[in-house]
Structure formats: C-alpha cells, structure tokens
Amino acid sequence: VPSTIELRDAVPDDLDEICSLIRELAEYERMLDDVVLAPAVMAGHLFGPDPSARVTMAEDGGTVAGFALWFPTFSTFLGRPGIWLEDLFVRPEHRGRGIGQALIRSLRARTDGRVEWNVLDWNQPSIDFYGSLGARPLPGWITYRWTPDESAPG
C-alpha cells in the first residue's frame, strides 16, 4: 500500500462523506433508487452511545478514497466473534492502489473469526478482487431478507 494511503476510524465529521460514498456505491451497484438513508438517523447508528455499525475510512493523500462499513457478528459454530462487511467501496480514481485490500486486511486484523460479506452475482470485478485475496463463495447458502415494511408471519 502506498505511503499516501491512511486508514482510520470514522468520526462524526465524516458523516456527509460516508453518505456520499454509500450513494456512489449504490449507483455503481445500480441500486441508487433503494437508498433512503437519513443522515441524522445514520449518525445515531454510527456514532451514538451504542453504535450499530462502524466505518473505516481510507484516505489517499488526504482525500477520502473509500470506506468499509462493518459490524460485529458471532459464530456459534466457531464460538467466537467475527465481522460482517456491509459495504466496501473505493472511488474509481483511487482503485488499483491497494486501498480495497488494505480495508479488508484492517478488518481481518480486528478479529480472529470470520469476515463475511455479500457480492452481487453480476459484479465480476469485485468477485475477481475478493478471489485474489483468497476469499471464496459459500456453497449451499442462500441469503434471506425480511424488511420491516413486509408482514411478518403469524
């Protein structure tokens, strides 16, 4: 990783930049219409007294180049905590400099458990990138989602 790359934990002053990065990621993933985040609510979840998630910021020469938004998980089979990587994004003009790799490594350094994430099945550049790091898809697993605006069974 070039010496101009710096990783750091996000602070409340990063909120606008985090929201911009999320929108840029959503645009890249062709899901911009799905983004309904409210910055004030997001601030509470990231920087409140009991944060739901954390953000690692990546700067390249003092400019925000990307981020990883993640939160702790727990594996009952391993009997230890891990990390779920919700979002990883490096701005196009900063790609190819080792920033994504540095962000992933920073998460692996935070846990001796699993680091897990999803990737869209059409996103071959990301699939290739994750494969180059030694990560592999989980055969036999399907991701499910229940959203609060859908009726719950029973």
Show which residues each predicted segment covers.
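Conserved GNAT acetyl-CoA-binding A-motif
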Residues: T111-L120
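Conserved beta-strand in the GNAT
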Residues: M57, T63-P72
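A short beta-loop-alpha structural element at the N-terminal edge
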Residues: E6-I18
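A conserved beta-turn-beta hairpin within the catalytic core of GNAT-like acetyltransferases
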Residues: T73-L85, R95, G113, L138-P139
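Conserved acetyl-CoA pyrophosphate-binding loop and the N-cap/start of the following alpha-helix
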Residues: H94-S106
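Conserved active-site alpha-helix within GNAT-family acetyltransferase domains
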Residues: Q101, D121-G140, W146
